[in-house]
Swiss-Prot record:
The lineage of its organism: Bacteria, Bacillati, Actinomycetota, Actinomycetes, Micrococcales. GO terms for cellular component: cytosol. It comes from Micrococcus luteus (strain ATCC 4698 / DSM 20030 / JCM 1464 / CCM 169 / CCUG 5858 / IAM 1056 / NBRC 3333 / NCIMB 9278 / NCTC 2665 / VKM Ac-2230). A motif ('KMSKS' region) lies at residues 298-302. Its cofactor is Zn(2+). It holds the Pfam family tRNA-synt_1e. It catalyses: 1D-myo-inositol 2-amino-2-deoxy-alpha-D-glucopyranoside + L-cysteine + ATP = 1D-myo-inositol 2-(L-cysteinylamino)-2-deoxy-alpha-D-glucopyranoside + AMP + diphosphate + H(+). GO terms for molecular function: ATP binding; cysteine-glucosaminylinositol ligase activity; cysteine-tRNA ligase activity; zinc ion binding. Catalyzes the ATP-dependent condensation of GlcN-Ins and L-cysteine to form L-Cys-GlcN-Ins. This is L-cysteine:1D-myo-inositol 2-amino-2-deoxy-alpha-D-glucopyranoside ligase. Belongs to the class-I aminoacyl-tRNA synthetase family. MshC subfamily.
Amino acid sequence: MKSWSTPAPPTVPSRPDRLRLHDTATGRTRHPGNDGRRASLYVCGITPYDATHLGHASTYVAFDLLHRYWRAAGLEVAYVQNVTDVDDPLLERAEATGVDWRALAEEQTDLFRADMAALEVLAPDHYVGATEAVGLVVDAVETMLAAGRAYRVPGGDGEPEGDVYFDVRSAQSATDWRLGQVSAMDLDEMAAVFPERGGDPDRPGKRDPLDPLLWRVHREGEPAWDGRSLGSGRPGWHIECSVISRAHLPAPFTVQGGGSDLRFPHHEFSAAHATAVDGLPLAHTYAHTGMVALDGEKMSKSLGNLELVSRLRARGVEPVAVRAAILAHHYRSDWEWSEQVLTDAQARVTRWRAALDGPHAAAGVAVLDAVHAALSDDLDAPRALEALDAWAAGTLPGLVETAADPVPVVDVVAALLGLRLR
């Protein structure tokens, strides 16, 4: 599947700060990418309908900061993102609107690509649809069945014979993975959110209510692929990310990213499936973004309370202002989108642009030091923007000493923050 195009970031001098990133799984600070010359990143992609709302955009802009930070440090970065281009919510939306599910997925994925390019999100090296990874899924599920890490559920109660589920208990007894080690949730928390996030705890024949689906055998009217010994059907949700990441990244890779609503079950079981197949952890560090609200509630496809990047662009809103509005909030915080947030961001962009014609436009070292230090501290973008405010006001420390520095501020801001002011 094709990705999108974004200009290469300007080159800026490296800095000695070491990245500190919060790891959801342990609750501790990690230093990903500080121990070598390579880093790898997997960010879970969209299910292509209602693209691209501000919750999506906030997540991809956040991990774009990490990508840019590593690249500015001189690391060779491998970045992979998936597209869940076949899944129940997509099929339900297609049926409700009378659109072919493939046409809906293609249209919304194209829209997502355009939005990401407009927001200056650096493109992944591999952009992979779930439908492109079916063969890899079949390989993995057959391996788990043979090892006793998965099982077939009998038919009945209107369900056909042969759906394959992951055996949580067997996996825990035979591998180093333990339920909750990625999500840092207890059983009560997991049980509460599982049915809200695609789980089916009451499915007859399951060995444990939390066992997730690996392979859904064909139902009338649903798309299906050749599953060899599994029978005709389609992948479950979590397994797609397990196999796509394994196909394109080291095992384990450096950082798994996504929204906080993916902690469980998605990231928990993506990690479990990968370990059940080859015995290796999925990732070293798990990082999650906060939720974006609108009108007092989490922005959600199911609720329909969405602000779309494409809608803002159609209104004539500058994408750089949308990106600045997102960066004004720490990536791990929950926050609320509003017109005032956008107005404030546009005003900041206007001030920064005016300062590019002022006496400190070449004071790149002072700005670089401040922005890099902020991003080194758990990608603290709000602090980085405050440094830009201080630069524009002429109050950032070091401006006098570095006023003749050859590093343009405009390059620093574009390279590290993805804000193209010119």
